[in-house]
Amino acid sequence: MIDITRDTFETEIIQASMQTPVLVDFWAPWCGPCKSLGPILEKLETDYAGRFILAKVDSDQEQEIAAAFGIRSIPTCILMVQGKPVDGFQGAMPESQVKAFLDKHLPPAGEAAEDDTTYDTESTEFAQISPEAQI
């Protein structure tokens, strides 16, 4: 798990997602649902053993990043692949639903993502986000 700031955003999210999918968790310390989702995400990052990177953005401290992603409620998670948002979800979800979300986008365990893997970046509301242009 990586805590993201404006200074580390480019390296830890955009550049890192070129090699490994990055799940960006927008949260705040006062947010009750964030407190229940956070441990689930951290457990899954361990369980998935390198298939994705968990990056956490404190929306209170990093308002510029949250604004660039159009975050309106927390928790919000956005999956970044090859520098672009491919999908996401809002609100706390049980572990089974988070796993289903991850399994939809990540290569199976033991398989690296193919270089020619394509992601449908047009079909979700998150496709409209262009954070690299605004941060």
Question: Where are the model-predicted features located?
Answer:
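Non-catalytic, surface beta->alpha helical segment in thiol-disulfide oxidoreductase systems
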Residues: 72-114
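Hydrophobic heptad-repeat coiled-coil signature
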Residues: 28-34
